[in-house]
Amino acid sequence: MASMPTISFGNLRRRDDQVEKGVLEACREAGFFLLDLRGDEVGTRLIHEIDQLFHICEETLNLPDNVKEQHQNDIPRSFLGFKPLGQAKTENDEPDRYEMFNMSQDGLMGTEPLQSLPPSLYGHLPVMISYLRHCQDIIAILNVALAKQLDLPESTFTALQSPTKKSGTVLRLLKSYASPHAEDLRTFLIHHTDFGTITLLANIVGGLQILKPGGSPLDESAWTWARPQPGCLIVNMGDAMTQWTGGILRSNMHRVIHAPGAQRFVDKYTVAYLARPERDASMKRLLNTHDVSDNEEDEGLTAWEWEVKRAMSMARAGYAPQAKEPKA
């Protein structure tokens, strides 16, 4: 099992210095940790919303195909909407085994017009927007804690990712298919790091794996299971935090494969909040470090330019979802 420390959300909200130090250590070492929502008033409300979102996720990703097709993503123009099964490839050039539906934070918050949604989702907007706001609060709390522990002004990271400004931040609903057959026991979502700042992941069934520090993604023994825990979010750092801190905070490689044990016989539903910087935020490093490896050329880019560059790199490698084939 992956070594993921558990951080108390209640103590973090109270700005406990030792808890904040624990967050920094986790983000430097593994880049992943569990955020325990239990025993806290706000955390309890979050748990209730997550339970509702799991039902919404299942309902949405089991809509008829003709409904999904009306709201399918339009790659490369837009990644919003449904990503169908098999649209991306794994490391063995096999089709992926997951579907997802991406909703823009900008649309949900009113920064931009709301994207077209399946009719069933409009009635769920209040709980989705409430959850979105709670996630924004968590991100802000983590950003302040990390800035403080890095001896930066507490507003350093929050100033670069205001929820009221345009960004690539999304609320994502995912379905990973059950694996009843031997040929299903493979990679579902290829190894990758997240583009953004911080990801908040809610799931019940296993399948997420984290690469050990120093391990090769081609070495199966270097992959460790990230076990979900009741009442906890899985939190991980994204590439933007690594870029801003000159490599001090770690954006760790991870992947999704078939669930372990008997869990592989059921479909897995996941709710993810993927925070990204404001589109116009600078990707210039905020800390002077000795790491001058390969990212100096990115310092003059805006966050949007930087994300497009990374997305195109993934697309050239064949790992990103591909554009629809034109119909004959």
Language model features: what each stretch is:
Residues 1-328:
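Peripheral, non-catalytic segments flanking oxidoreductase cores
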